[in-house]
């Protein structure tokens, strides 16, 4: 009752014995949950949601006008590569490996946000620099959608909550991992 089921599922998945025995250690559980699940995944999602909420918009998603403004083909290839690696790992029942690839997507998102620094442009007038930065935030929104879908086997309750916070009405279970960047993003 003291710990969220998803954090326990995450720890058990990332620490599960695939080739050798393993022990459950509370200190390692706390460390992995704080540094990986919260520090990488949770921090990225929180930043995207908070920054998007701070944008003024009359109706709909405030990021929709920035979607595709900048060329993010390199980032998209990196994310697609991580998704492909995760799918391949899941098919081979290498769940830890799959989870590492998915967490790699969150790391890509964090790097994208850090480089774009959209918090600097939230209250600025329209400019190419602002649009470029907010285009990265828009892509980060898509990455959150991808993470909700791909993390579903490991953190189902959190994934459902994130899917809903992103404004998605369709069933998350009907979205293929390889389509998760483009489906249900409400941009």
Located regions from the model:
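Conserved, charged catalytic cores of large soluble enzymes
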Residues: 45-86, 106-133
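Alpha-helix initiation and N-capping motif
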Residues: 5-7, 72, 76, 83, ...
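Aromatic-residue-lined binding/catalytic grooves and analogous aromatic/hydrophobic interfacial grooves
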Residues: 57, 95-96
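Catalytic adenosine-cofactor/nucleotide-binding cores of aminoacyl-tRNA synthetases and other
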Residues: 1-68, 169-186
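Basic, alpha-helical terminal appendages of large translation-related enzymes
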Residues: 88, 92-94, 103-187
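Short, charged/polar, low-complexity loop and linker segments
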Residues: 21-26, 80-88
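Amphipathic alpha-helix face/heptad-repeat signature
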Residues: 33, 37-40, 44, 71, ...
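Residues that form generic nucleotide/phosphate-binding pockets
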Residues: 2, 11, 32, 78, ...
């Amino acid at each position: 009752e003291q710990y969220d089921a998803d954090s326990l599922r995450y720890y058990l998945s990332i620490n599960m014995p695939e080739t050798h025995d393993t022990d459950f250690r509370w200190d390692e559980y706390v460390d992995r949950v704080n540094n990986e699940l919260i520090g990488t995944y949770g921090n990225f999602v929180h930043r995207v949601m908070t920054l998007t909420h701070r944008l003024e918009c009359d109706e709909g998603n405030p990021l929709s006008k920035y979607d595709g403004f900048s060329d993010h083909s390199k980032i998209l290839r990196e994310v697609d590569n991580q998704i492909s690696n995760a799918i391949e790992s899941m098919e081979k029942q290498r769940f830890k490996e799959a989870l590492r690839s998915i967490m790699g997507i969150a790391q890509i998102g964090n790097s994208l946000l850090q480089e774009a620094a959209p918090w600097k442009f939230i209250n600025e007038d329209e400019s190419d620099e602002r649009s470029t930065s907010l285009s990265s935030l828009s892509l980060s929104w898509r990455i959150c959608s991808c993470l909700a879908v791909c993390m579903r086997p490991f953190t189902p309750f959190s994934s459902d909550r994130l899917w809903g916070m992103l404004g998605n009405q369709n069933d998350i279970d009907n979205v293929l991992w390889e389509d998760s960047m483009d489906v249900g993003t409400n941009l």
